[in-house]
């Protein structure tokens, strides 16, 4: 009998997948199965956690003009 | 700079999340092929990976797939006798 596991299928870019793998690496409580470069099966209760952490990571990687201006005037 | 922000927003938009069931650990490729074909015909197949013998169905389709597997395995057992 094959196994049936309840989860949430995530379809995304390889770069986003790498970020999710990174988020999972500390506790390994998010990813049920790494299906391929652009597909993941994750634990249903962890979808919101992943969404929040991704948003935070992506925001940190976004250019902040105010920060640059502060640096420039500091010189 | 503006282009970069747009790119990130686009990447967030490109993430799709769908509730479902992951079917795995098929006995052999024949079993995988039969069951995934059934799921496809039902229109409940979200994702398939024949190389790994794994596929994902919609939440609603999972029960019918489980019933199909039971029927299939029963048939195979009786034909072996």
Swiss-Prot record, chain A:
It is found in: Nucleus. GO terms for biological process: nucleotide-excision repair, preincision complex assembly; transcription by RNA polymerase II; transcription initiation at RNA polymerase II promoter. The keyword DNA damage applies. It comes from the Eukaryota. Keywords: DNA damage, DNA repair, Nucleus, Transcription, Transcription regulation. Gene3D superfamilies: TFB5-like. GO terms for cellular component: cytosol; transcription factor TFIIH core complex; transcription factor TFIIH holo complex. The keyword DNA damage applies. Component of the 7-subunit TFIIH core complex composed of XPB/SSL2, XPD/RAD3, SSL1, TFB1, TFB2, TFB4 and TFB5, which is active in NER. The core complex associates with the 3-subunit CTD-kinase module TFIIK composed of CCL1, KIN28 and TFB3 to form the 10-subunit holoenzyme (holo-TFIIH) active in transcription. Belongs to the TFB5 family. Component of the general transcription and DNA repair factor IIH (TFIIH) core complex, which is involved in general and transcription-coupled nucleotide excision repair (NER) of damaged DNA and, when complexed to TFIIK, in RNA transcription by RNA polymerase II. In NER, TFIIH acts by opening DNA around the lesion to allow the excision of the damaged oligonucleotide and its replacement by a new DNA fragment. In transcription, TFIIH has an essential role in transcription initiation. This is General transcription and DNA repair factor IIH subunit TFB5. It comes from Yarrowia lipolytica (strain CLIB 122 / E 150). The gene is TFB5.
